[in-house]
């Protein structure tokens, strides 16, 4: 039976084994997917052992996405630009392909929620690894503009410069944004995990916009609660992005795209128990 794994530290909280087990059942694939705690300085050894034992592919979560980027012998274009890898696949020639499916997971979840991105103005909050991983797939949807904002403006400017060849992307200081100019706001910061807000002006929120928080929790996230209370038309958390990036990884490994909607519904139910 083909074996797959997710590496992380910590890893006990990972929903990936649950998601991929449902995907395998849905698509009648004979495969096993487990979670493995890798030592903080031991990703390479853990990956070596896994692939040497016949492993076919793995997902990578914090803090190993940059280690996985270095580990891969080949990189997809989106992984190169993301500077991080969340999916590894053993190739027939023995090489290891590194890919990043996070951004596609985000886009697929937005589309599943009937959020149109073509011709829209998108504000991306944050300029860390989570933001960098989603910019290329967002630009591929042809928004009229993607603005990156961050507390440290220079980081946002660096990302805007990196992705400028791929679409209309710019940067802005977070304290200069005070007009309701955006159709979609995506929060890529992890501030909400500790109940914090990213520091946006309330005047950005309007009734016909979508606010998306890339983190998720059993209850509404701090960012989405803030946006909803200010009258945002739709708020979405990152649970669907988690399922979407998993579906993209599954497609890379097995050549079949599983359906996300049913798995997301089941995952949401378990999260709220």
Swiss-Prot record:
The keyword Amino-acid biosynthesis applies. The active site is at residue 65. Keywords: Amino-acid biosynthesis, Aromatic amino acid biosynthesis, NADP, Oxidoreductase. SUPFAM superfamilies: Aminoacid dehydrogenase-like, N-terminal domain (SSF53223), NAD(P)-binding Rossmann-fold domains (SSF51735). It catalyses: shikimate + NADP(+) = 3-dehydroshikimate + NADPH + H(+). NADP(+) binds at residues 77, 126-130, 150-155, 214, 238. One of its GO terms (molecular function) is shikimate 3-dehydrogenase (NADP+) activity. InterPro entries: Aminoacid_DH-like_N_sf, NAD(P)-bd_dom_sf, SDH_C, Shikimate_DH, Shikimate_DH-bd_N, Shikimate_DH_fam, Shikm_DH/Glu-tRNA_Rdtase. Belongs to the shikimate dehydrogenase family. PANTHER family: BIFUNCTIONAL 3-DEHYDROQUINATE DEHYDRATASE_SHIKIMATE DEHYDROGENASE, CHLOROPLASTIC, SHIKIMATE DEHYDROGENASE. Involved in the biosynthesis of the chorismate, which leads to the biosynthesis of aromatic amino acids. Catalyzes the reversible NADPH linked reduction of 3-dehydroshikimate (DHSA) to yield shikimate (SA). This is Shikimate dehydrogenase (NADP(+)). The lineage of its organism: Bacteria, Pseudomonadati, Pseudomonadota, Gammaproteobacteria, Vibrionales. The gene is aroE.
